Amino acid sequence: MASVTSEKCVILSDGTEYDVTNYLVANKDAADLLRRYHRQEVADILNATSKSKHSEAVVEILKSAKVPLKNKEFSDLVDQNIGVGYGNEFIVKPTDLDKDFEKNHFLDLKKPLLPQILFGNIKKDVYLDQVHRPRHYRGSGSAPLFGNFLEPLTKTPWYMIPLIWVPCVTYGFLYACTGIPFSVAITFFIIGLFTWTLVEYTMHRFLFHLDEYTPDHPIFLTMHFAFHGCHHFLPADKYRLVMPPALFLIFATPWYHFIQLVLPHYIGVAGFSGAILGYVFYDLTHYFLHHRRMPNAYLTDLKTWHLDHHYKDYKSAYGITSWFWDRVFGTEGPLFNEQGKISTKAK
């Protein structure tokens, strides 16, 4: 097992990474101080008018690092100081709201966003270019969408998804078992679970990313932003990441009626229940890919894969819970090299 002092230690300052591992190994007395700032942005501390003993020590340590690490390519957005690191190590940097609006003249993040799109006379080409250039709202709050009593309806904490839908899945499966044998019910439940992965891919690629096929009209651009554009514009907003239950109900109802048309009632209920569980996995996976460190290599690659979709190429990597259907339909994205293997350069 590696000693505490031999483990890699990186400190961030103004979007630049400093590898101070060698200093830590040579100066074991500084280990506690350095570990305190590992993978943290310290620019505000270092630039403070009244520096503490600790901040002065960190300044000297960064100077001793001599050459900062070059950030791994993370699209041209890294150059815009939007974040540092990659994959599990990616850390967002808050957007300077005033400078962003002054530079791009797109949306003022301090004002309600939907009215700006609806009444702002924004052309589609400008909208599509800007909405796929992520911004990060300061603090733990959310940028306003409506700016009125409707605002709370646009926010959904992640835990509401299992809290609402897992009981529905359980009830649906048990209900199906009253009309068909358990073995049949569980078979179609599993089929529904895996069918969701195709629905997930199809919905993300052909519905949420209509993009160029969206009519060049403020109403349609506003709808695009409300459905998915907002998430690409503000990907780190933890309250506008999972799908609001009311919106999911609107999406799910036509699918339920379609399944009831093509399958016997109880079989349809079993399959639909499995698909709903697939959706729960999808939404939770999506949330944690954005907001948690992944515990193993596969999930770390999956996180990298999804961040590529946001920060490198939004026209690829549509799968969230897996890349299976992207491999089938040739939309793998930057994580895979030309031989179809995970590219070490992408990491």
UniProtKB/Swiss-Prot annotation:
One of its GO terms (molecular function) is iron ion binding. Its EC number is 1.14.18.-. The keyword Cell inner membrane does not apply. GO terms for cellular component: endoplasmic reticulum; endoplasmic reticulum membrane. It holds the Pfam family FA_hydroxylase. GO terms for biological process: fatty acid biosynthetic process; fatty acid metabolic process; mannosyl-inositol phosphorylceramide biosynthetic process; mannosyl-inositol phosphorylceramide metabolic process. Zn(2+) 2 binds at residues 231, 286, 290, 306, 310. InterPro entries: Fatty_acid_hydroxylase, Scs7. The chain crosses the membrane at residues 157-177, 179-199, 239-259, 261-281. Ceramide hydroxylase involved in the hydroxylation of sphingolipid-associated very long chain fatty acids. This is Ceramide very long chain fatty acid hydroxylase scs7.
